[in-house]
């Protein structure tokens, strides 16, 4: 005869997320709070708890931030020690971490907004080192390009791709994003690209990221003269090589 046991524990179809939440907490929570600072001294949620809650939404199949309140809270709150915050708290924290835009004026008098997101870009690198995805002392190849992101937000501008959106510059190592700097969708890709790259490479150097080669699309050859590559870090394990992709007229050092 089969034995039937009555269990009093609560069951959840999302229990698999708990081990990921615990790994996140042990690996990244201290890095997040030390980089962003403490959000509260007593009651309330720290930034690490908010980022973990945001991560859990998408790991559990959610499609928007509000899903944590409407669908997931009853399940995620079953964890005995790790707290999950509401969608309102997540949205407030995102607004708190927003950095103001930098406005540049072109020769024709038009203004274009850039958002450097310095603190969040620093956090991105810190988390990659803490999680072992990047390692100090290793040499890395950095690729840079611009992306066009379609959006219907109030500040979206018309792009040359015939839709409204943003035009972030993105730096990657293999498949890891190591820097993002947003700008208006109607900004020419050449416009103040040198300043974007300077900020990226200064941040890489400050965080101990050793660059072997740098690659970018062909617009670099007409945007930056060779002397502009002094923005690249020189304190590397061996002489820095700036390797440009085809069509860059052999700019190297």
Regions found by a protein language model. Give the residues of each.
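Basic side chains
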Residues: 52, 167, 213-215
């Amino acid at each position: 005869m089969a034995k039937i046991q009555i269990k009093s524990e609560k069951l959840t179809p999302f229990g698999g997320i708990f081990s990921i939440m615990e790994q996140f907490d042990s690996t990244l929570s201290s890095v997040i709070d030390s980089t962003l600072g403490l959000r509260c001294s007593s009651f309330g949620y720290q930034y690490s708890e908010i980022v973990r809650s945001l991560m859990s939404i998408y790991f559990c199949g959610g499609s928007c931030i509000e899903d944590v309140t409407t669908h997931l809270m009853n399940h995620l709150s079953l964890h005995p020690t790790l707290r999950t915050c509401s969608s309102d708290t997540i949205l407030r924290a995102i607004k708190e971490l927003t950095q103001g835009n930098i406005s540049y004026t072109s020769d024709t008098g038009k203004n274009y907004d850039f958002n450097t997101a310095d603190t969040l870009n620093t956090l991105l690198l810190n988390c990659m080192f803490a999680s072992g995805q990047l390692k100090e002392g290793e040499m890395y190849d950095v690729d840079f390009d611009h992306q066009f992101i379609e959006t219907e937000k109030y500040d979206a501008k018309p792009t040359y791709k015939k839709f409204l959106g943003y035009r972030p510059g993105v730096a990657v190592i293999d498949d890891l994003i190591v820097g993002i700097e947003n700008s208006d969708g109607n900004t020419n890709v050449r416009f103040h690209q040198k300043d974007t790259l300077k900020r990226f490479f200064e941040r890489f150097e400050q965080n101990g990221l050793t660059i072997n080669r740098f690659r970018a699309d062909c617009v670099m050859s007409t945007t930056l003269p060779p002397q502009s590559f002094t923005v690249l870090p020189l304190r590397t394990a061996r002489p820095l090589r700036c390797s440009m992709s085809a069509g860059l007229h052999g700019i190297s050092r």
